[in-house]
A protein has these predicted regions:
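Conserved short alpha-helical segments that host acidic/polar catalytic motifs at enzyme active sites
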Residues: 1-309
């Protein structure tokens, strides 16, 4: 459980003081979903800046320059990777064609280790599941709707991604985790957070009383929304991954039945597990990779049938 937050001041109506007040209020409110680390990404002076530390957001007192109009942020609740290492905090930096981008993720990815093997991704000291999304984008050598769609359809688990590219386009890739986005058309401002309660709390705490009567911009699971630095929106979609079907019941005969624990012998059981995995679109190599990573046969079987390890 982490939190995404940020804003787009596309009409440049906020003063420097107002921007920083809003940023800090959102970041502090986002601590509700994580205090292990916090970070932000933004452009200034013609380059991407990422500030992140393994500390709660309120301690960091984020500050951005007046020229910055788009900022994305993240508070971390560590689930994978050393919580004390700043390089495991979000946002992460990537690079495509000499241009840097930033990515943050709320959720848990279950197949990052499989993707490292199957996609031949480079080794990294970063220990989080989220970083695989950066590597997948870099491998495609493109950052656009098509490349984001492919990543969203490759990963397994829960997610909302925010991605800031070199042109100050902010992408929202909406999986099955929460996201709340407000638009203030009169002021020319978008503000977002992972939940409505956090967003409302951050706005109230900012003291920016002129931010009233927002229009909620709805996004659903399977949506990819891009907002450019001028406030223009474009929406595309990805296929919602169907890797995790309902657990088997007698009423659903087309899903293969779980193997009985009472009749297992180790070799035969692993062979059966490989056969069952093929019904879900996974190769023998995928199962052997999970086994080599230390997952037990029971854990892999749970993953296949219920999406849980």
């Amino acid at each position: 459980m982490c939190c995404l937050f940020g804003f787009i001041d596309y009409n440049h109506n906020l003063s420097g003081k107002q921007k920083n007040r809003l940023l800090r209020s959102l970041a502090s409110a986002a601590e509700e979903r994580g205090t292990d680390a916090a970070g932000i990404a933004y452009h200034a002076g013609g380059r991407l800046h990422i500030m992140k530390k393994a500390k709660p957001a309120h301690v960091l007192r984020f500050r951005i320059p007046l020229e910055t109009s788009v900022v994305m942020g993240h508070t971390r609740y560590a689930t994978q990777g050393d919580a004390k290492k700043a390089y495991n905090a979000h946002p992460f930096q990537g690079q495509i064609g000499g241009k840097k981008f930033a990515l943050a993720h709320n959720g848990v990815l279950l197949n990052d280790r499989i993707l490292h093997k199957t996609e031949n991704l480079p080794k990294t000291h970063i220990g989080t599941d989220s970083y695989v999304a950066v590597q997948l984008l870099e491998k495609q050598n493109a950052l656009n709707f098509n490349s984001l769609r492919k990543v969203a359809e490759q990963v397994q688990g829960t997610f909302v991604f925010t991605v800031l590219d070199a042109q100050d386009n902010l992408y929202f890739v909406h999986g099955d985790n929460p996201l709340c986005l407000y638009h203030f058309p009169k002021q020319g401002i978008y503000v977002y957070a992972s939940t409505q309660s956090i967003l409302e709390h951050g706005l109230t705490a900012s003291g920016l009383s002129f931010l009233k009567k927002p229009v909620e911009v709805k996004t659903d699971e399977g949506d990819i929304l891009r907002i450019d630095r001028h406030g223009e929106r474009k929406l595309q979609h990805f296929c919602i991954n169907s890797f995790c079907p309902p657990c088997y019941s007698d009423a659903i005969e087309w899903y293969p039945k779980p193997l009985s624990a009472g009749r297992r012998n180790p070799d035969a059981y692993w062979e059966g597990l490989v056969s069952v995995a093929a019904s879900f679109g996974y190769t023998p190599k995928d199962i052997h990779t999970l086994r080599e990573c230390g997952f037990t046969s029971d854990e892999i079987e749970d993953f296949l049938y219920c999406g849980e390890i």
